[in-house]
């Protein structure tokens, strides 16, 4: 059973990351799940349990991405980015900092995938239009992709990993926010510092800001642009209301996304079919399929091994527990993707004989490691692979070697300081 479960998991993961001839990740994961069921590695009751765990998370994620795609077509993100350029007043360093801050805000409210895949092309087009060299463009591109993950901690909806973990351990919106807002600030500050230290020689000291277009010129539909702000306020209230009413957050985000699609239907700036097609529907199938395969590892007793390791680490106190869990999940995410990692770790945490504040430390450190760890390697998250593909299409090629060298140097210190922020949160508040 152990060998078979491990084999099914590794083969499924290989095909998900490799995607031969464009094989869809949803189909691959479901195929792996089907094999796991017919071989007896998982039962039908496991299938229902997995569906119960992931349905809210994945539908929330898809809804948020749908909303962000409409906002992108309207021009909200480009409008925001142009404001950042004007605020920089010709300073390359200020522009670098403001773009990172914008990325952090977008990641918090529209998920890491939305920030990386929507904001990066906008930033790329802007720095090219300004006339930056390839050497000068690289820091802005890496920063846009990096900050999307490192600051996707504060809200449950900021990352699919967050939603999965919060649903698994029944963590409320406000409870999650109270624990992750300080770590996210630590991550933002550490990211700013580390990115600046790493790229300080490549960032231009100044640029000509006279030819940057006005923010108003980025808006493709002024009426829908104004409505967008109302939608954002309602979305935020939806997050809060879902907590007090105990109604799944996906119901609120789904209704808001549907209404927004109806409102955008008459806009010339938004192609509804294109927006709906652009949503990550395959993530729903991928989540269910991949997590069924992961449950096979649980049934085979593999997650119990990790549970024992976590129990051992917890004997050395809260700080060691947080650091250990954070770096374990980061390492696993970097080599086998953060989506299966977060659930494997969550299952192990649930199986471990760790309680109280130590268990809380494990839960949140797992989220932090699974959010930040993927930046170490290109295969750490599906978003990174897609991000690299988008850049290649725009004639910006970043080799896996270059990405790994940059990613590991930048990620490790940021991960440490973010985990330190979690430790301080738990002991002080």
Swiss-Prot record:
The keyword Transport applies. One of its GO terms (molecular function) is arsenite transmembrane transporter activity. It comes from the Bacteria. Disulfide bonds: none annotated. GO terms for cellular component: plasma membrane. It is found in: Cell membrane. This is Arsenical pump membrane protein.
């Amino acid at each position: 059973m152990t060998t078979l479960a491990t084999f099914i998991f590794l083969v499924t993961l290989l095909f998900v990351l490799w995607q031969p001839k464009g094989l869809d990740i949803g189909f691959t994961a479901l195929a792996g799940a089907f094999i796991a069921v017919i071989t007896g590695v998982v039962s039908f009751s496991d299938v229902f349990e997995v569906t119960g765990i992931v349905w809210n998370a994945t539908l929330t994620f898809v809804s948020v991405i749908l909303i962000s795609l409409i906002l992108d077509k309207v021009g909200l993100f480009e409008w925001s980015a142009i404001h950042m350029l004007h605020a920089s007043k010709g300073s390359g360093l200020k522009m670098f900092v403001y773009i990172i801050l914008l990325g952090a805000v977008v990641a918090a409210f529209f998920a890491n995938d939305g920030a990386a895949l929507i904001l990066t092309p906008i930033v790329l087009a802007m720095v090219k239009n300004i006339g930056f060299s390839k050497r000068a463009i690289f820091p802005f591109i890496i920063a846009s992709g990096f900050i999307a993950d490192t600051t996707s901690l504060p809200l449950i909806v900021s990352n699919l990993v967050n939603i999965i973990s919060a649903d698994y351990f029944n963590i409320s919106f406000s409870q999650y926010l109270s624990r992750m807002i300080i770590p996210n600030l630590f991550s933002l500050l550490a990211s700013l510092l580390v990115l600046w230290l790493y790229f300080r020689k490549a960032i231009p000291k100044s640029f000509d800001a006279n030819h940057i277009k006005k923010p108003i010129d980025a808006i493709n539909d002024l009426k829908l642009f104004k409505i967008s702000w109302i939608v954002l306020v309602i979305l935020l209230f939806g997050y809060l209301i879902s907590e007090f009413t105990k109604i799944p957050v996906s119901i609120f985000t789904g209704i808001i996304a549907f209404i927004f699609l109806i409102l955008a239907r008459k806009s010339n700036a938004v192609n509804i079919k294109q927006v709906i097609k652009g949503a990550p529907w395959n993530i729903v199938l991928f989540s269910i399929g991949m997590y069924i395969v992961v449950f096979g590892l649980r049934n085979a007793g593999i997650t119990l091994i990790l549970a024992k390791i976590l129990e051992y680490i917890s004997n050395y106190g809260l700080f060691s527990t947080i650091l250990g869990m954070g770096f374990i999940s980061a390492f696993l995410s970097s080599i086998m993707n953060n989506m299966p990692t977060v659930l494997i770790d969550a299952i192990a945490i649930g199986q471990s004989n760790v309680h109280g504040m130590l268990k809380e430390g494990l839960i949140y450190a797992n989220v932090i490691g699974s959010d930040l760890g993927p930046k170490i390697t290109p295969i750490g998250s599906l978003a990174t692979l897609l991000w690299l593909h988008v850049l290649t299409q725009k004639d910006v090629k970043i080799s896996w070697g270059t990405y790994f060298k940059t990613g590991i140097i930048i990620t490790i210190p940021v991960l440490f300081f973010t985990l330190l922020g979690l430790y301080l949160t738990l002991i002080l508040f």
